[in-house]
């Protein structure tokens, strides 16, 4: 039996099942094996199988910034229920992003396998500001010149129905802009929204195809609103929320596919029903045998798992490096030591900032090598100084760049204390929106869960 007959004797479903267990980089290479394999790997059946398998085993994605250099790792998320109060897991290296000269860290977000870096200066030559869309699982990224004015912040949204990624840039006094990734005619498009509601500085969050962000009412300073942007239909909606409630928010979160607000407050009362004037308060006190909470760590909130576990991690690299999972329903805390992250370098000695993203899944969305430019509305920009062979027009340049692993970075500054720090788990309060249907802004109700750590 020759090789071709052996392959033909294997059922296609079995071949796809085997291939779906491979890393994304390997699948990308296997497209070149033959036309048959390329067709199989590009089929909707294989894409669905791969995404479902990846979603059933989500990982923790870690981005470590050392000077201007980013390194990306991932590690398994623990299964629930916990058999132990502490675990050790190994991290896998994905890529190193060496072309970044400087990055404003407040503009970093994650959506379905992609990382969005809003304000970045690329390479050592020049000072050209770009946005970067990075895919750690394949080692690829886009460098995109932003619209002008570039806006106070932007975010990456994902349309789960149309399977499209879009970048939204929000401005205070000008139109907003949006860019759809992967289309044949990539360009920034201006979109209209009410100038009455202006976005605040907090980063948006995308939940089920809707980007949420905190805004304020320019006509009534006592009114605070949450903006809702439908990624698929590119429409804005706004609903009012209690001023004192929004004032204590500094992070919008995804809590079991519902919008949540994460403040650093000791406790909070929440209005459940406006007509009945009904308030509620929920408190969770950690068991006294969880001694890990007494360790003096600078921790930051990084997200919530699909099971409702609240995840906190060290803000800066040090050895050992811990991530904590708190389950408010079971009142349990799990500490996970992540090993193998940058241990071959001086990664732990220079206060490198660590960004952690929960529920990381691999997908087969590929950047197109043939697309090298997009258009920017009504402006001209100088070309970036990125060292790559590609065409650009007078408006904007989009590039597909492979990561470089050999660039050395020696200048490292110590960052200031981030306001998203929780020392000793002093307090954690979670606000959850029960109804996240943006079409009915008058029907929102909130509940509260306050975790007090001893």
UniProtKB/Swiss-Prot annotation:
InterPro entries: F-box-assoc_dom_typ3, F-box-assoc_interact_dom, F-box-like_dom_sf, F-box_dom
Signal peptide feature range: none
Source domain of life: Eukaryota
Coiled-coil segments on the chain, per record: none
Segments forming domain F-box: 4-53
Transmembrane regions: none
Cross-referenced PROSITE patterns: FBOX
Pfam families: F-box, FBA_3
PANTHER family: BNAA05G37150D PROTEIN-RELATED, F-BOX ASSOCIATED UBIQUITINATION EFFECTOR FAMILY PROTEIN
Name of the protein in question: F-box protein At1g67130
Source organism per UniProt: Arabidopsis thaliana (Mouse-ear cress)
